């Protein structure tokens, strides 16, 4: 049986299918040096990396069997859904979940799912050690592959989050598979903030954009200002100002969040983002580098309006990311985040040992030590070699440093930080005595 150190290596490494390494290479692989490159790191002006590669998860293999269609359960209905026990991740609807499964119990379970509705439950553990979960998300398999490695049957899966649920009951079958009785949570769709005071005779005067309008040039900006003024003109009939209604308007909230997202990806196009407020709010939730406590809070929210308001509040206030173990050692900030994937700056990836890491890409990180030599094996970003990165203070695993294998690639280096190792914090300001007194919109 592998010791605790072996299990940690398996969790942090992307390659090394075999758990044991040759004895003569152990000293080289454990070599520890301070990461100096981050001090001079600058945001890349040009990115020639194919941003579609990370989302395709090519490291799982190209010949996966794909499925079409989707399984959706009725709102408020009660369902009994099997649980994958090794998945320790808070899955967001619409988020992709790659998996590599080795345990015979899980392999058998997935085979049975393929013959049925391909849906399993991912529990949002509020306490992983005690396996406590009140909420979760259904996941549907859309790509599947079986193979054998040294006589061990391996199942590789790509799944996507579908619907939120509340856990009603958990029970374990005789074969060891856990079944969850859940209630599917509905999405509360709120009417327009102006619907209560909008005169039906003036409905024909409203203007609606046929498609998302570019805000890049001044002309588009003027159009947007005019559109907003016309949209909230009925506020003049009430005792409340127009800006108050805009605080709860889905379109306005989405536009404010898009401005933040463009700071992470200057080439971001509106066409690449969901136009539906519900899907958009989940897309943002999946790429926010927040801890499990905040993510579960977002998962509980049943209204896209409230979810968008909370996400905007988090993006504005939680600007520093620290080591979760040290809690005060800053690793990076919101300004250093950039996107190297079509799905945004953060996505879930799985290593050959089956450990799933939600990895945030940043162009600058500090207070890190590098462990071992660079390796291209099983790299989540093809063309880049990875090196394990640890906190310089407490030596806890933070993520990886990625370096380009070719000189013409841009960026030449970046860091991938695992969400589970980061703690979002609110920096002290002169106007605030303590960050604890700052209340997020949850």
From Swiss-Prot:
Disulfide feature: none
UniProt binding sites for (S)-thalidomide: 378, 380, 386
Chain sites annotated for binding Zn(2+): 323, 326, 391, 394
Biased composition annotated in UniProt, kind: Acidic residues: 24-35
Residue positions where Phosphoserine is found in the record: 25
Start and end residues of each Lon N-terminal domain: 81-319
Subunit comment: Interacts with KCNT1. Component of a DCX (DDB1-CUL4-X-box) protein ligase complex, at least composed of CRBN, CUL4A, DDB1 and RBX1. Interacts directly with DDB1. Interacts (in pomalidomide-bound form) with IKZF1 and IKZF3. Interacts with ILF2. Interacts with TRAF6 and ECSIT.
UniProt protein name: Protein cereblon
Organism: Homo sapiens
């Amino acid at each position: 049986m592998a010791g605790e150190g072996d299990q940690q290596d398996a969790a942090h490494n992307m390659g090394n299918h075999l758990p044991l390494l040759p004895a003569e290479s152990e000293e080289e692989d454990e070599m520890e040096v301070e990461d100096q490159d981050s001090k001079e790191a600058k945001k890349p002006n040009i990115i020639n990396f194919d941003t579609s590669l990370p989302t395709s998860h090519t490291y799982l293999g190209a010949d996966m069997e794909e499925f079409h269609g989707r399984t959706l359960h009725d709102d408020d209905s009660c369902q009994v859904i099997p649980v994958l026990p090794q998945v320790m991740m808070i899955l967001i609807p619409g988020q992709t979940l790659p998996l590599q499964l080795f345990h015979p119990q899980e392999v058998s379970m997935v085979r049975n799912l393929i013959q049925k509705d391909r849906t399993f439950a991912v529990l949002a553990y509020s306490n992983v050690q005690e396996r406590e979960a009140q909420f979760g998300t259904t996941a549907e398999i859309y790509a599947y592959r079986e193979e054998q490695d040294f006589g061990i049957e391996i199942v590789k899966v790509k799944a996507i989050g579908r619907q939120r649920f509340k856990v009603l009951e958990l029970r374990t079958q005789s074969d060891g598979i856990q079944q969850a009785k859940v209630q599917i949570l509905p999405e509360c769709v709120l009417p327009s903030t102006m619907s209560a005071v909008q005169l039906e005779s003036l409905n024909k005067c409203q203007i609606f954009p046929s498609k998302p309008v570019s805000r890049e040039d001044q002309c588009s900006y003027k159009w947007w200002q005019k559109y907003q003024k016309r949209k909230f003109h009925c506020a003049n009939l009430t005792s409340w100002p127009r800006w108050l209604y805009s605080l709860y308007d889905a379109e306005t909230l989405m536009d404010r969040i898009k401005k933040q997202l463009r700071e992470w990806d200057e080439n971001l196009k509106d066409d690449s983002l969901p136009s539906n407020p519900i899907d958009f709010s989940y897309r943002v939730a999946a790429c926010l580098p927040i801890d499990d406590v905040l993510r579960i809070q977002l998962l509980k929210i049943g209204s896209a309006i409230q979810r968008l308001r909370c996400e905007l509040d988090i993006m504005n206030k939680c600007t520093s990311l620290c080591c979760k173990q040290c809690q005060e050692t800053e690793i990076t900030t919101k300004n250093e985040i950039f996107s190297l994937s079509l799905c945004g700056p953060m996505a879930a990836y799985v290593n050959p040992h089956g450990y799933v890491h939600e990895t945030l890409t940043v162009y600058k990180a500090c207070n890190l030590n590098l462990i071992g030599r660079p390796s291209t094996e099983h790299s989540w970003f093809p063309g880049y070699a990875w090196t394990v990165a640890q906190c310089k203070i407490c030596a806890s695993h933070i993520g990886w440093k990625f370096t380009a294998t070719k000189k013409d690639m841009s960026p030449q280096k970046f860091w991938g930080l695992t969400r589970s190792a980061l703690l979002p914090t609110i920096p002290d300001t002169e106007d605030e005595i303590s960050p604890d007194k700052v209340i997020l919109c949850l």
